[in-house]
Amino acid sequence: PYPRNVFSCGQAKQGVSLFHTNFTNRIDKTSYILNYGQTPLVKSRYLKYVTKEKHPYGENAIVAIMCYSGYNVEDAVIINRASLERGLFRTTYFNMYEAHEEKQNIGNAKVDTVFMDIMRNNVIGLKPDYDYSHLDKKTGLIKENTYVNTKTVVIGKATRSIIEKDVYIDASKTTKKGQIGYVDKAF
């Protein structure tokens, strides 16, 4: 049934593991990577043909079921803090930002949206309190290995004003709210 397939695909997209061995060379919209994946302790016979038993996925967590301090804790999980601090279940979230240059005809006027150096004098409408300093002067893209937060512009883009031909209006792309990290690739 169709709704069940959609639900199943949605659940699979949320799975955290090493979904592909060339994830560093791929550009996916979003991906979750388990940093310290392990090969499973219990394996199926089919696994040795598919992955040669070298493809890590999941974590081998040791679980003990018992009463804690005399009370029955049925709906709780107690995890060792030292294990978490050493990296148990640590994941990396990759997110892609994309933009396009466009040429549009609006009435008799041609409107161009282009990647550019936003810090030029003829660009108006800059976003207040946003950091444009990490953008490349030639391409308008953020430089690789740059730390980004919610106030960082990742793609410098501007639209030519219809009224004044030499004036551009800022249309830059920023990170989503709450996302912090480092730029992996920019092209």
Residue ranges and their predicted role:
Residues 1-187:
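Conduit-forming functional cores of very large proteins
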